[in-house]
Each structure stands twice: as structure tokens, then as C-alpha cells.
Amino acid sequence: MGFSSLLTTCRYLLYSGAGNSFILGESMPSLEDVLFLCQEEMVDGFLCVESSEIADAKLTVFNSDGSIASMCGNGLRCAMAHVAQCFGLEDVSIETERGVYQGKFFSMNRVLVDMTLPDWKKAERKLTHVLPGMPEQVFFIDAGVPHVVVFVSDLSKVPVQEWGSFLRYHEDFAPEGVNVDFVQRKKDDLLLVYTYERGCERETLSCGTGMLASALVAADIFSLGQDFSIAVCSRSRNLIKIFSEKGKVFLEGPVSLLNRSENFGWLEPKSRRFG
């Protein structure tokens, strides 16, 4: 494959959302661009931020395999940080495939988004078959993308790649497949979560919707009440806060700018449009 056209024609940034790594660009990439750049930069996905007629910006999320994700919690927070700093905003709205999401930019260490959905489609499932040592009881939830949450007593003993790949392609969740979250409850309000991500086809250092899914299921099965607050730690050891207030559910955590292409003058004053 030749040198990617996106590297020479477009500006892009490298972001991390609590360990979830992304390339962010302001124009729609080709499939070739996504595959090349995600492999070249060893990131989890590509965030395309464009102008929107109904929000401050529009976000399209590409997985590292080139497929489009309907939602990505950490990617959404990275996009909100980008838009907030481009336009000098605190309150930010982002149009996505799942609708318009509202968020708040306090600082790069604290970017919050309202992840509330009208129906989480939560359901406990007994798997038709499992690998040796794997729990049969799992929890399905739609947190913007489909997740299966598996509670374990000791995450250090879980073969995340093997079990994650098995469940991601499990016949019980065909044909779409699922993201898979392995969860250990460390304290009443602290979870450790390792996620195998569909579209990356491997464990990632962090997954926003996976942390959200795990916290929502934990709040139910451990009877934490309607208004709860849970800290979630991922493989990256970054903490994400998931909390519920007055029927709304929020995802809050850090965002980091890792690098930028030489011609990306993203801090230059902008009008309220991209492109």
C-alpha cells in the first residue's frame, strides 16, 4: 500500500480517551486511509469531526478494521474536547448515528458526556455453550453499541483475548456480534474492567461504552439505587466515573492530545464550522 493521501492532504490529531487511542481528522477518510493510519499509528479507531446543521459538530467513528461504530464513549469525549477547544465552548453538542449527545468540557482531565438512552435493552443470558472455566451467566446491554458483561472473581486469571474472541463471535449474539467486558468488583463503588472490542478484534486499553455497560449492569445486580456513582478502572489504569442523576447517566474522564500532524493548526481561531 502506498503512502496514505490523508497524511498529505488532511490535518489530523492523535488523541487518547482514558487509554482509548484515536486519530481525529476534519474530513471524511477513505477506507484505505482508515486502515493505513490505524495500523501506522497503532490506534483503536478514526474520529471524523465535521460540521453539523443540528449540533456543534458531527462525529463519525471508524473502528480500526474500517467498519463504522454507531457509538464510542471515549471517542465521543475526545471529539467534545476537540470541538470545545476549537470554538471556545464549555457546553458541547455532537451529532452521531445514535442521535445528538450533550456534554461539558471542564478541562482535558475532565470531559463529561450524557450517555442516556431511552432503552438499554438489558437482559441476563445463559450461554448455550462456553469455554472451560467461563461463566455461563452473562448480561447483554446496548450502551450505544452491543456489549456482553461477564463478572469474574479474579481478572488476572481471565484469558481476555481467547474468551473475548469466543464471545464476540458467539452464536447467541450472531450475526452482529458483541463487545465483551470482563468485570471484577473491587469495592462497592469500584470496578476493574477489561474489554475485547468488536471492530478492533482485540483487547483495548480502555472502552468507554464497555465501562458504561459494566457500571449499569453492576448498579442493577448489586442494587446500588437509581442515583449511583461508580469509578471504573481499565487496563490503562485510567479512572472513568459513571454516575446517574435524575434518570440521566453520565460518562466522565480524562482526554489527552498525544500528537498532531505538522500542518494541523487546530488552535487557530475557527468559525463555527469545520472543513
Swiss-Prot record:
It is found in: Cytoplasm. InterPro entries: DAP_Epimerase (IPR053407), DAP_epimerase_AS (IPR018510), DAP_epimerase_DapF (IPR001653). Substrate binds at N20, N63, G73, N74, N179, E197, R198, G208, T209. The keyword Cytoplasm applies. It comes from Chlamydia trachomatis serovar A (strain ATCC VR-571B / DSM 19440 / HAR-13). GO terms for biological process: lysine biosynthetic process via diaminopimelate. This is Diaminopimelate epimerase. Belongs to the diaminopimelate epimerase family. The record marks H147, E197 as: Could be important to modulate the pK values of the two catalytic cysteine residues. The keyword Transmembrane helix does not apply.
